[in-house]
């Protein structure tokens, strides 16, 4: 009845005196509205009179309009007009799509992502659910709207839960029926039912939301629906969900991102509510919880009491979940519950469901809201773990609770349950608590089962980065991850830490994805569907395991810290997943896991520049995907939008992509870079000096912080210093704040619970490893740098290939410098580093170091300072000669001198450069002002004409040497490459253009100016004045279009600003650029 009622209600759009749209408009304007009585007939011929009354639901706290609570009054005419108010709160599309909203005070279910529907009133929902489901006291109806609203609900929608949403169907409705109901509800066709798991599902998250609500609303119905999903409906839906994930990520993700975040927060309480309401229809909370709780319950019920026992089991599961939530984290329990319930639901419901669930749960929105969902789930998980630990629950207890809450689906509860179990082993000590947190986080992608189940769906989705595979891949990757994690967890804390790093990465795949909504959009731009969502998943799946391998097996990759950094980059990575999926990327990440993670994050922006540099073909993609990761963009213009984002993965994948994308010479370059591994990081970094900026300071953290700045998580780096290993940077501003809160909580928790916890975490995260790895990396890089520096300096011809590699090594040099101020940072190595990216490598690192120094981690700060000191000394020696010349002949010195000078200035003349930079920033702003109008006009030229200046700007922003780089790109690439200005220039213009366009370098630029005023001044000095002057000389000489310093700035800003919306930032890059990246990513 309710389903038909809703269908009828939503079908009354044309030729009616009223329509649901008009009805809701009226409700939105007047706060309430009611429809005339309308009739419809049931399958049995019963005539039902219905009237829908909707009230505008406002957030009691913010008084924001969140959605509509629609009450449908139904009367069976046969039965004598007995009004049977089956109050079905149907989530209607709320005016405020993204507003989070707590529908029910008790449920605290927010109408996050109410973009599709508002959440029904909890009380109404409960009534409705009860009426519909035999007074099952399900407030699930409410949830549907919310679920619907939040990205998580989008994701959750995809689950059986959504199908069983009471609003969508009557208690007896099967998942399919409910889905049908959902479809109308979703403002979509009946196919919506299936759609909820399809890409449309994300779009139709409203229906999904409703499904969430219904899931527990009608315990048995919901469970049956879930079971049906798991048995078959779910499978098809899930398989579709894999697809929808990308779509969700593409479209809703943007909308849902914040809601998702709110949803996560809401979810936590909703989850608790959900548990409490288990009898009532925990679904309400779960819906906001992304349905994972409901899914979990369903899963439990489905798995434990597949059929009849579902109701009891459901309530039982709910109780357990409630235990988990209330005990472990009433607010944060949701995350764990969401993850594990989702996981469980996915597992039990169906592989298909699992896939979405896994994605949703482990990927935390990998499907519908890859980034926001995953980030939220991670945050939730963090909260859960934190809360569990805070509440004094031992890891064993947490594991037990989680396992119980999850029911038989221990693997299902992998994120919470298995993680808890693993933590159980670790319960003896706080270290184990940390391990628990890490493991839970790691397990956050409880794709163990999901991966297994999803893998079938994915059909080797890990390898394939098919869109559907997107959700599947993450599961698959996650599955691997969980396995690795589980083994590692059981292994030891170090393994856990490695896992944690990896987990953080995977977690932050989602979170980053979340944070990189532009990335999501980019995914939409360039096959984001297949790439974007699925990418994040694959990245997650591939990367986390890789990270683990990296952290465990490849200390060079900075241990788990790099993974964490990578996680930081993961926000980009979610778009990078394809890259991440690439073995190369893994290899590259192995070496540059952390380095690239950070740089790549910036790279994601710069990669476009790279793309431009590597090929204008990419540039076109880059233009529209400037946000996309430059490395990816470079690797593949077509992937630029979606993939470029995966900056982290990009470093490795960038090369692979380059391999594929780059013309012969570029593949060679890639090979060179890959040969030096540094190139991997370099692959990204070279593309955007900004990346080096991120990388050099401290690849793992500095880079991360730098990247975060660009990604709008600049403030995160500080928190991250201690907790960033555990927690990746949030993708969203909200995610960031949320993540920051989480990080703060985790930090407090770890700090309070264990004074040495942070040190342990550092050790676990591989900070010591970072140093040792820095040494290993340094030796490695030393070889590479020595080789590449020599190649760079000696083989100007190979400059392009070597330039980037040289840059890469410098970056790595910066990294290893950062990791240790080893002799490896020999003059040559550093010169190569600083020569190719003296300022970039050093500057960025300096900037990065500053952020790191800001962070509590003295070890890293000291390490960075030490390395920087050595770098400065070496670079100073190298640049000393140049230094004298570069100030005067900034334009003339261009390549080597200026690079060195820029480097020298950046390090030795930071103050001077700051002043100059301020002056030049103004100039640049003026130029930007001039260029902003021209961004579109200049955008294409920047590819070619402006690209030199762009590259210079990017590189320049990354380092004072950038100015030389601008014009003599060789300079940008290496001090030892001044002879190759024309060549470098030729190559780098596209890169410059792309970088500028991407804005990552600008981000980096912004960041280092931010992080390192010295950087700014040196940059500004070398770049604005030198650059502008050079623009006058080089652009004029080299590129007529850029004869103007203003033109150059304009070009630079155009490409970066127009593409990344960083035009404003470009002028600010020097002064306020840091905000540019944040704004850009926010």
Curated annotation (Swiss-Prot):
Residues 138-219, 237-317, 330-374, 405-429, 455-485, 507-543, 592-617, 644-663, 691-717, 981-1004 are annotated as: Disordered. It is found in: Cytoplasm; Nucleus. The modification N6-acetyllysine is found at residues 316, 319-320, 387. Its main location: cytoplasm. Pfam families: DUF1518 (PF07469), DUF4927 (PF16279), NCOA_u2 (PF16665), Nuc_rec_co-act (PF08815), PAS_11 (PF14598), SRC-1 (PF08832). A motif (LXXLL motif 3) lies at residues 723-727. A motif (LXXLL motif 2) lies at residues 437-441. GO terms for biological process: cell dedifferentiation; cellular response to estradiol stimulus; cellular response to hormone stimulus; cerebellum development; labyrinthine layer morphogenesis; male gonad development; mammary gland branching involved in thelarche; multicellular organism growth. Residues 250-268, 279-290, 464-477, 507-516, 603-612 have a biased composition (Polar residues). Its EC number is 2.3.1.48. Contains three Leu-Xaa-Xaa-Leu-Leu (LXXLL) motifs. Motifs 1 and 2 are essential for the association with nuclear receptors, and constitute the RID domain (Receptor-interacting domain). Nuclear receptor coactivator that directly binds nuclear receptors and stimulates the transcriptional activities in a hormone-dependent fashion. Plays a central role in creating a multisubunit coactivator complex, probably via remodeling of chromatin. Involved in the coactivation of different nuclear receptors, such as for steroids (GR and ER), retinoids (RARs and RXRs), thyroid hormone (TRs), vitamin D3 (VDR) and prostanoids (PPARs). Displays histone acetyltransferase activity. Also involved in the coactivation of the NF-kappa-B pathway via its interaction with the NFKB1 subunit. Present in a complex containing NCOA2, IKKA, IKKB, IKBKG and the histone acetyltransferase protein CREBBP. Found in a complex containing NCOA3, AR and MAK. Interacts with ATAD2; the interaction is enhanced by estradiol. Interacts with CARM1. Interacts with CASP8AP2. Interacts with CSNK1D. Interacts with DDX5. Interacts with ESR. Interacts with ESRRB; mediates the interaction between ESRRB and RNA polymerase II complexes and allows NCOA3 corecruitment to ESRRB, KLF4, NANOG, and SOX2 enhancer regions to trigger ESRRB-dependent gene activation involved in self-renewal and pluripotency. This is Nuclear receptor coactivator 3. It comes from Rattus norvegicus (Rat).
């Amino acid at each position: 009845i309710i389903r038909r009622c809703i269908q009828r209600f939503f079908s009354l759009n044309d030729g009616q005196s009223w329509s649901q749209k008009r009805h809701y408009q009226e409700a939105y304007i007047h706060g309430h509205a009611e429809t005339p009585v309308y009739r419809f007939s049931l399958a049995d011929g019963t005539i039902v009179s219905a009237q829908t009354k909707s009230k505008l639901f406002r957030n009691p706290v913010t008084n924001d309009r969140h959605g509509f609570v629609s009450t449908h009054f139904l009367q069976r005419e046969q039965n004598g007009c007995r009004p049977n108010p089956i109050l079905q709160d149907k989530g209607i599309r709320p005016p405020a799509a993204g507003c989070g909203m707590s529908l029910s005070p008790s449920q605290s279910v927010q109408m996050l992502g109410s973009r599709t529907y508002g959440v029904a009133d909890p009380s109404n929902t409960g009534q409705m659910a009860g009426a519909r489901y035999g007074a099952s006291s399900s407030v699930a109806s409410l949830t549907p709207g919310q679920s619907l609203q939040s990205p998580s609900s989008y994701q959750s929608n995809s689950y059986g839960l959504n199908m069983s949403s009471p609003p969508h169907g009557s208690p007896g409705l099967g998942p399919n029926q409910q889905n049908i109901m959902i479809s109308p509800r979703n403002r979509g066709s009946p196919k919506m039912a299936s759609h909820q798991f399809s890409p449309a599902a994300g779009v139709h998250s409203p229906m999904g939301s409703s499904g969430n609500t219904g899931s527990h609303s009608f315990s048995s119905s919901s469970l049956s629906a879930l079971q049906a999903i798991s048995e078959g409906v779910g499978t098809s839906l899930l398989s579709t969900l894999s697809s929808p994930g990308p779509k969700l990520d593409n479209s809703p993700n943007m909308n849902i991102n914040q809601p998702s975040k709110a949803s996560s927060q809401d979810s936590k309480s909703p989850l608790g509510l959900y548990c409490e309401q288990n009898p009532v229809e925990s679904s309400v909370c779960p819906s906001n919880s992304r349905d994972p709780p409901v899914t979990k319950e369903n899963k439990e019920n489905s798995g434990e009491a597949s059929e009849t026992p579902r109701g009891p089991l459901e309530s039982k599961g709910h109780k357990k979940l409630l235990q988990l939530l209330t005990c472990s984290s009433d607010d944060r329990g949701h995350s764990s519950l969401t993850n594990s319930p989702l996981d469980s639901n996915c597992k039990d419901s169906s592989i298909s469901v699992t896939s979405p669930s896994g994605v949703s749960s482990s990927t935390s929105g990998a499907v519908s809201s890859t980034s926001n969902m995953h980030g939220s789930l991670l945050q939730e998980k963090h909260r859960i773990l934190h809360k569990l630990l805070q509440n004094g629950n031992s890891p064993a207890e947490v594991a037990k609770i989680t396992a119980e809450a999850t029911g038989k689906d221990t693997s299902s509860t992998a994120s919470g349950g298995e993680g808890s179990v693993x933590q159980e082993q670790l319960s003896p000590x706080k270290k184990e608590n940390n391990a628990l947190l890490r493991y839970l986080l790691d397990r956050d992608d409880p794709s163990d089962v999901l991966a297994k189940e999803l893998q079938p769906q994915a059909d080797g989705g890990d390898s394939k980065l098919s869109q559907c595979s997107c959700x599947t891949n993450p599961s698959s990757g996650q599955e691997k991850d969980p396995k690795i994690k589980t083994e590692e967890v059981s292994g030891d804390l170090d393994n856990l830490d490695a896992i944690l790093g990896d987990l953080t990465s995977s977690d932050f795949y989602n979170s980053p994805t979340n944070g990189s909504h532009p990335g999501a959009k980019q995914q939409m731009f360039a096959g984001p569907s297949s790439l974007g969502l699925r990418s994040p998943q694959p990245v997650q799946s591939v990367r986390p395991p890789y990270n683990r391998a990296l952290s465990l097996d490849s200390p060079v990759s900075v241990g788990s810290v790099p993974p964490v950094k990578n996680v930081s980059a993961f926000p980009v990575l979610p778009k990078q997943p394809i890259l991440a999926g690439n073995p190369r990327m893994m290899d590259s990440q192995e070496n540059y896991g952390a380095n690239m993670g950070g740089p790549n994050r910036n790279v994601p922006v710069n990669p476009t520049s790279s793309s431009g540099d590597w090929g204008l073909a990419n540039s076109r993609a880059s233009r529209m995907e400037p946000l996309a990761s430059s490395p990816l963009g470079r690797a593949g213009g077509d992937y630029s939008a979606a993939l470029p984002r995966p900056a982290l993965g990009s470093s490795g994948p960038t090369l692979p992509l380059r391999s594929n994308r780059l013309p012969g010479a570029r593949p060679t370059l890639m090979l060179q870079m890959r040969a030096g591994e540094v190139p991997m990081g370099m692959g990204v970094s070279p593309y955007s000096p900004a990346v080096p900026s991120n990388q050099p300071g401290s690849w793992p953290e500095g880079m991360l912080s730098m990247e975060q700045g660009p990604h709008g998580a600049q403030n995160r780096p500080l928190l991250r210093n201690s907790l960033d290993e555990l927690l990746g940077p949030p993708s969203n501003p909200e995610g960031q704040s949320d993540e920051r809160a989480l990080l703060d909580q985790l930090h407090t928790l770890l700090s309070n619970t264990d004074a040495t916890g942070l040190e342990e975490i550092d050790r676990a995260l591989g900070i010591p490893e970072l140093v040792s790895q820095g040494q290993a990396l340094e030796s490695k890089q030393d070889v590479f740098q020595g080789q590449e520096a020599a190649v760079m300096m000696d083989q100007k011809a190979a400059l392009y290939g070597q330039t980037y590699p040289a840059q890469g090594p410098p970056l790595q040099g910066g990294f290893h410098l950062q990791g240790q101020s080893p002799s490896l940072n020999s003059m040559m190595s550093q010169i190569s580093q600083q020569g190719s990216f003296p300022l970039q490598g050093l500057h960025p690192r300096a900037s990065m170091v500053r952020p790191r120094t800001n962070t509590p981690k003295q070890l890293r700060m000291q390490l960075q300072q030490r390395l920087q000191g050595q770098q400065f000394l070496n670079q100073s020696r190298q640049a000393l000669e140049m230094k004298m010349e570069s100030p005067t002949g900034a334009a003339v010195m261009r390549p080597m001198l200026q690079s060195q000078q820029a480097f020298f200035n950046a390090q030795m003349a930071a103050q001077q450069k700051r002043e100059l930079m301020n002056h030049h920033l103004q100039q640049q702003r003026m130029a930007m002002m001039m260029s902003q109008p021209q961004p579109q006009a200049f955008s294409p030229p920047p590819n070619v004409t402006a690209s030199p200046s762009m590259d210079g700007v990017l590189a320049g922003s990354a380092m004072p040497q950038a100015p030389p780089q601008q014009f003599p790109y060789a300079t940008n690439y290496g001090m030892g490459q001044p002879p190759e200005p024309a060549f470098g220039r030729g190559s780098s213009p596209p890169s410059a253009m792309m970088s500028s366009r991407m804005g990552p370098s600008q981000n980096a630029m912004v960041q280092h100016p931010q992080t390192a005023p010295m950087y700014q001044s040196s940059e500004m000095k070398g770049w604005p004045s030198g650059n502008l002057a050079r623009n006058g000389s080089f652009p004029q000489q080299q590129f007529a279009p850029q004869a103007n310093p203003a033109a150059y700035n304009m070009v630079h800003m155009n490409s970066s600003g127009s593409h990344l919306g960083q035009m404003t930032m470009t002028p600010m890059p020097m002064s306020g650029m840091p905000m540019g990246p944040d704004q850009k990513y926010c």
